[in-house]
UniProtKB/Swiss-Prot annotation:
Subunit record text: Monomer.
Record region (G4): 136-139
Gene: tuf1
Gene3D superfamilies per record: P-loop containing nucleotide triphosphate hydrolases, Translation factors
Pfam families, per the entry: GTP_EFTU, GTP_EFTU_D2, GTP_EFTU_D3
tr-type G domain: residues covered: 10-204
Annotated organism of origin: Shewanella putrefaciens (strain CN-32 / ATCC BAA-453)
Span list, region G3: 81-84
NCBIfam families for the chain: EF-Tu, PRK00049.1, PRK12735.1, PRK12736.1, small_GTP
PROSITE patterns in alphabetical order: G_TR_1 (PS00301), G_TR_2 (PS51722)
Binding site for GTP: 19-26, 81-85, 136-139
Residues annotated as binding Mg(2+): T26
Reactions catalysed, as given in the entry: GTP + H2O = GDP + phosphate + H(+)
Positions of region (G5): 174-176
This protein's name: Elongation factor Tu
Length: 394
């Protein structure tokens, strides 16, 4: 019996708070929870419940994250908040909390600070598509001109990293005052919620994206041909569809002549399902684990890319020593390890466990990839890092 399907009447959107330490990310998270629960119904979460973030493990990396949910009249939001800067870095790089949009919190008493910049850069690198600014602690600034100055600074900083700094919404408010129930500041939280609704477009569901299945196994069935198995990552494949086999070697085209799930024949395989795909005229040796089956033209194989990487600390089971240029680990994409070489940024001689770093990777064979694809860095099967493809070079 298949599990009951998770049906929601309203569209579901993933967001999160980012910004410098002590600028009020967690207070804002609590304020949104309270004001929206009070206005539209739902359960309010307190600061202490959010601040006490449970520890999670994502690909062997320990991350502290708080997840809360809230509703506006038109949408359901899942919101992530992290206690420490390192948690943000890990969260964004591993994709543990994929964000459809982020709320950048900037204290108007301080203006943009080092982590403000770093979180904007990370958002750009890992592909957070939209940023909305909440200028916090505005109740503590009497000077209107000072607020304007801070807003200008934040907008310029966002433009510097290719976000539309001039056009994105900036809300001036006070999370603490809103949490204390002061109507003029509660109104600012509702303004922020309205900005989330209008500025972040409804995300495309996995099922509506072009078909892609990472190949895990290949079988030959006498009299029927070759079957590849795996979990459909996105889209739908139907019997009779033309598909491409991409990665590792030259791309080839074939046709899906059958879809099987739990030994039953189906007309189609959909995102999230584990299935076997029968391929016309394909030999057992033409396909291997590590390739993907995809809608023709939807994804290309690449070998060289810029990435943002988090290197596991010794405590997380990572390396005990730094690595240098010339380091040649394995890069694990979807279902397979590929050896690659790295190029460190100018002036960087070595990378310490626990660091995050931008690096250019060149693989020894091509892998089907898009910007935003996550990977692990491994040494002999042990994970020592996590990364994301920021920009494809070749």
């Amino acid at each position: 019996m298949a599990k009951a399907k998770f049906e929601r009447i309203k569209p579901h959107v993933n967001v999160g708070t980012i910004g410098h330490v002590d600028h009020g990310k967690t207070t804002l998270t609590a304020a949104i929870s309270h004001v929206l629960a009070k206005t539209y119904g739902g359960e309010a979460k307190d600061f202490s419940q959010i601040d006490n973030a449970p520890e999670e493990r994502e690909r062997g990396i320990t991350i502290n994250t708080s997840h809360i949910e809230y509703d506006t009249p038109s949408r359901h939001y899942a919101h992530v908040d992290c206690p420490g800067h390192a948690d943000y870095v890990k969260n964004m790089i591993t994709g543990a909390a994929q964000m459809d949009g982020a709320i950048l919190v900037v204290a108007s008493t301080d203006g943009p600070m080092p982590q403000t910049r770093e979180h904007i850069l990370l958002s750009r690198q890992v592909g957070v598509p939209f940023i909305i600014v909440f200028m916090n602690k505005c109740d503590m600034v009497d000077d209107e001109e000072l607020l304007e100055l801070v807003e200008m600074e934040v907008r310029e900083l966002l433009s510097e990293y290719d976000f539309p700094g001039d056009d994105l919404p900036v809300i001036q408010g006070s999370a603490l005052k809103a949490l204390e129930g002061e109507p003029e500041w509660e109104a600012k939280i509702l303004e922020l919620a309205a900005a989330l609704d209008s500025y972040i477009p409804e995300p495309q569901r996995d099922i509506d994206k072009p078909f892609l299945l990472p190949i895990e196994d290949v079988f030959s069935i006498s009299g029927r041909g070759t079957v590849v198995t795996g979990r459909v990552e996105r889209g739908i494949v139907r019997v009779g569809d033309e598909v491409e086999i991409v990665g590792v070697r030259a791309t080839t085209k074939t046709t899906c002549t059958g879809v099987e799930m739990f030994r039953k024949l189906l007309d189609e395989g959909r995102a999230g399902e584990n299935c076997g795909i029968l391929l016309r005229g394909t030999k057992r040796d033409d396909v291997e684990r590590g390739q993907v089956l995809a809608k023709p033209g939807s994804i290309n194989p690449h070998t060289t890319f810029e990435s943002e990487v988090y290197v596991l600390s010794k405590e997380e089971g990572g390396r005990h020593t730094p690595f240098f240029k010339g380091y040649r680990p394995q890069f694990y994409f979807r279902t397979t390890d590929v050896t690659g070489t790295i190029e460190l940024p100018e002036g960087v001689e070595m990378v310490m466990p626990g660091d995050n770093i931008k690096m250019v990777v060149t693989l020894i064979c091509p892998i089907a990839m898009d910007e935003g694809l996550r990977f692990a860095i491994r040494e002999g099967g042990r994970t020592v890092g996590a990364g994301v493809v920021a920009k494809i070079i070749a």
